[in-house]
Structure formats: C-alpha cells, structure tokens
Swiss-Prot record:
Physiological role: Involved in chemotaxis. Part of a chemotaxis signal transduction system that modulates chemotaxis in response to various stimuli. Catalyzes the demethylation of specific methylglutamate residues introduced into the chemoreceptors (methyl-accepting chemotaxis proteins or MCP) by CheR. Also mediates the irreversible deamidation of specific glutamine residues to glutamic acid.
Gene Ontology biological-process entries: chemotaxis
Domain CheB-type methylesterase: 155-341
GO cellular component: cytoplasm
Signal found in the keyword field: no
Organism: Syntrophomonas wolfei subsp. wolfei (strain DSM 2245B / Goettingen)
Compartment(s): Cytoplasm
Gene Ontology terms for molecular function: phosphorelay response regulator activity; protein-glutamate methylesterase activity; protein-glutamine glutaminase activity
Enzyme kind, highest EC tier: hydrolase
Keyword list, A-Z: Chemotaxis, Cytoplasm, Hydrolase, Phosphoprotein
Pfam family, one: Response_reg
Active site: S161, H187, D283
Protein name stated in the entry: Protein-glutamate methylesterase/protein-glutamine glutaminase 2
Matches recorded under InterPro entries: CheB-like, CheB_C, CheY-like_superfamily, Sig_transdc_resp-reg_Me-estase, Sig_transdc_resp-reg_receiver
Length: 341
C-alpha cells in the first residue's frame, strides 16, 4: 500500500530560491510540492486551492511579511508552517505567531550547506506534518519559594526540540530570583540560541543568557546551551558550572539533551529536577532516566499539550518520567517540587 505524500506549499519571493527549494525537497518520495507562491496573497489562494499539509514560508516578503501573514492565517486556517529565515530575531516572532519550526537559510554557493539544509528541511517538513496545532493555554505562575541558600545546591535541567521555544518561555517567564539555577538545551542552530536567550532575558524576571564555558550556575539565572556546542554540568569547589565545547552530534543534535541530562545525573545526583518537553525523536530520554536513577525528580510534558509528542513519549515509556503534566501545569508542579527539596 502506497503511503500518502505530504502536500507542501513553498512561499518565497525569490524565483530562484523557490525552484531550488522545490527540487531539493522533492527528492524525498514522501514529499510532494503541490504549488509555489511569491507572496502572502498568492499563498492564500494556493492554500484554498490545494489544501497543503505543510507550508514553508520566508520571513521577509513584499506586500506582507511572513510574520504578518502567519498572524492573519492561523486563526482562520491553522496550518503547520516551517519558516525559512536568515539569522534574525524575527524568527521568534514567527514561532510566537504559530509556526512549528524554522530552518536557517543556506549559502546558495556552497553545495555542502545546501545538502545539510535540505536534509534538515525535509526532516522538519515531516515533523510538521504530524505536529499538533492548537491554542496555547495560559500558564499558572511559579510563586516565590521563600527559600534562599538551600536552593543553591539544586539544579533544574530542561530539554526540548520542536515546539520548545514557546514551551520553555511559558515556563521560564514565571521563574523568580529564588528559582534554582536552570540549564536548558533547546535544539537550535548556532547564532539563534544567543538571540533566543536575549529575547527571554528581555521578557523574564530572571537573567537568561547563552551559556559560555565555565559559567557558574546561579539561583535566579537560566543558561541556554549554545548552538553547535555540547553543554555539560560540572561541580567545582562546591559550585555548579557548565562546560561548553564543540562536539559531535548525539542523537543527531548538538547541543543534545542527553549530554546535558547525563552530566546532571553525574554531578547533581538527587539534587536536581529534570523536565523533558515537546519534540520529535528520543533525545533526552536516556539522560532523564539516568537522572531519575540518580534520585532526581523528573517531569514530562503530556501528549495533549505537546506540539510533537516524541521525546516525552519515549522518556515516559522508558520509565524516565516520574509524572506527566500539561504545559500549563508544569510551572505549578515544579513549584511544589522545589518546596519539597
């Protein structure tokens, strides 16, 4: 029996790039490019005519930007969208407007960059085709813990992939200065992790920064693993630090959640809370199991609230997750755990 192909609409104002995209993703037999469009208005007509399963969308376009198009489209016609973006903070506006994920634009003059780009884009189109679209629930606030020095010996570790930037924001935005030091791996390319950290820092009470080698893990601070670097937690002179080094991909990712979680299990043991959020694949499941075996408390995002119920599902089936919660309850569950520490 032949499986149904993923009907894909390409939206980009460059004729050359549209044609290159169409050729590149059509090489995968699971994907069918049903139409291309030069701008948002043509895209609207193509959506009505072809009813695509997934749309790729440029951020910068004439007449109407990709972000504005998303804001108008999603309430009326929810559709899985993968953004194609140059290195720009606007990609996070697109994710906030409802895009599932993004891919960084390649150097068109380098075949190696193009091959890597198409492999990533094809994978993300496939992930988007099974992603769950829906309205975001309001997240309960993480209240002050009333703790001080005791929390300095504790660490919160979070891992996420597809759908993660928004999920992480919904949790971290309610952190306060009494929240234990937090380390996060979000699958994201180099450059974008710095902009994501800066964006969170501008909108959250706690300090959020892209981690650098030998940064200390502090209360009321969040460290985001830099793209193309593996981040590990280490204990030195009674303090937690992070080591960030370029490394090989693990589970297809650098940074990888498993690398972080394994190091948290080794360095923090029972003095940690691990949280695995939305994302495709299995990254983080094995590391979260190591954390739980070391005595850490572990939380998984539930299926109903995930954009893609992959990583949390594998972790849950592996026995790594102590309890699953909807995204809008994870903050409250974390608050309760912190007060039990």
């Amino acid at each position: 029996m032949r499986l149904r192909r993923i009907k894909t609409l390409i939206v980009d104002d460059s004729l050359l790039f549209r044609e290159t995209l169409a050729r590149g993703i059509s090489r995968d037999p699971a994907i069918e490019v049903v139409a291309t469009a030069v701008d948002a208005f043509m895209a609207r007509d193509m959506i009505i005519k072809y009813k695509p399963d997934v749309m790729t969308l440029d951020v910068e376009m004439p007449r109407m930007s990709g972000i504005e198009f998303l804001r108008r489209l999603m309430p009326q016609y929810p559709l899985p969208v993968v953004m194609i973006s140059a290195l720009s903070e606007s990609v996070f506006d697109a994710l906030n407007a409802g895009a599932i994920d993004f891919v960084a634009k390649p150097d068109m003059n380098r075949n190696r960059d193009l091959d890597s780009f198409f492999s990533e884009l094809i994978l993300k189109i496939k992930i988007a085709s099974v992603a769950r679209l829906g309205r975001r629930a309001e997240v309960s606030k993480l209240l002050p813990t009333g703790k001080s020095q005791a929390d300095q010996g504790w660490v919160i570790a979070i891992g996420a992939s597809t759908g993660g930037p928004e999920a992480i924001y919904q949790i971290v935005k309610n952190f306060n200065q009494d929240t234990p030091g937090t380390v996060i791996v979000q699958h994201m390319p180099a450059g974008f992790t710095r902009m994501y950290a800066e964006r969170l820092n501008d909108t959250c009470v706690v300090e959020v920064k892209e981690a650098q080698n030998n940064d200390q893990v502090k209360m009321g601070q969040v460290l985001i693993a830099p793209g193309e670097y593996q981040m590990r937690l280490k204990q030195k002179a009674g303090n937690y630090m992070v080591e960030c080094h370029p490394g090989e991909k693990v589970n297809g990712h650098c940074p990888a959640v498993d690398v972080l979680f394994d190091s948290v299990a080794q360095s923090a043991g029972a003095r940690a809370v691990g949280i695995i959020l939305t994302g495709m694949g299995s990254d983080g499941a094995r590391g979260l199991l190591a954390m739980r075996k070391a005595g850490a408390r572990t939380i998984g995002q539930d299926e109903a609230s995930c954009v893609v119920y992959g990583m949390p599902k594998v972790a849950y089936e592996l026995g790594a997750v102590e309890k699953q919660y909807p995204l809008n309850y994870i903050g409250q569950a974390l608050y309760k755990l912190i007060n039990q520490l």
